[in-house]
A protein has these predicted regions:
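Glycine/tryptophan-enriched, flexible segments
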Residues: 2-159
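Active-site-proximal binding-pocket segments
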Residues: 92-241
Length: 241
């Protein structure tokens, strides 16, 4: 029933509020008269750069607006296979546009206009996922703590808390480091650590393993994803967990 309601809502959104025109980049930008005070980067408490903890990121990702459009060019040729291939982690049939979207290197409107004439089931499935991304942003506006706390009544006693025992903490660390002994879980978690990304189906599998097999509080998983994903978006990450 939930899935049916979501699909009906996605259809209504497109009918009532079609995406605006894709705006071209401005020819010039005027320099403001006054600049706001800037932050000191060290005050952001970012992860340390020595030792270099993210060399795999630079090998795996091309960053910037040009890279985002290059990836979109590739995706425009592949999106037709998305509906059938999106649940197969062994195949490269996902857009991997999420980091570019998260960091503002490309707009969902730009993606929509580029792909809207693709008359395939794959495009319609992907289109709903773009809407889901905006839906998560809307939810976080209504429930600002959604990324950390559920918006329905919740009993903490359901979950094992790593702060209450060494064994539980060890199980959490084994999950984080890809040492559970379950190949698909370990492969996904190691990929996450090396590249900052994981196939969406494997995200579901690893999250389900933490919650339903290890019975560890989901918020520990949500925080780990938030710390390690290059597309770690507060709204989408919280909504999906």
């Amino acid at each position: 029933a939930y899935l049916e309601e979501w699909q009906a809502m996605a259809k209504a959104v497109l009918e009532l509020f079609p995406p605006r025109d894709d705006l071209p980049a401005p020819d010039t930008l005027h320099t403001p008269k006054d600049w706001p005070d800037s932050d000191v980067l060290d005050d952001w408490s970012l992860l340390p750069t020595k030792p270099d903890w993210a060399p795999g990121f630079r090998k795996f990702w091309n960053v910037g607006e040009d890279a985002a459009h290059d990836r979109l060019d590739w995706w425009a040729d592949e999106v037709g296979e998305y509906d059938e291939g999106r649940n197969l982690p062994s195949q490269d049939i996902t857009s991997q546009m999420s980091p570019h979207l998260h960091w503002g290197e490309i707009s969902p409107v730009t993606i929509w206009h580029r792909l809207k004439d693709k008359r395939s089931k794959g495009w319609k499935t992907y289109e709903k996922e773009l809407i889901w991304r905006d839906y998560a942003q809307n939810v976080i506006m209504q429930f600002p703590d959604y990324g950390d706390e559920p918006y329905r009544n919740f009993d903490d006693s359901l979950w094992r808390n790593p702060n209450r025992g060494h064994l539980i903490q060890e199980e959490l660390e084994a999950w984080q480091q890809g040492r559970t002994g379950y190949p698909i879980v370990d492969a996904g978690m190691r990929q996450l650590w090396q590249t900052g990304w994981m196939h969406n189906r494997v995200r579901m599998i690893t999250a389900s393993f933490l919650i339903k097999h290890l019975l560890i509080d989901w918020r520990h998983g949500e925080r780990w994803f938030w710390d390690t994903l290059v597309d770690g978006d507060y709204a989408s990450n919280g909504a999906n967990w």
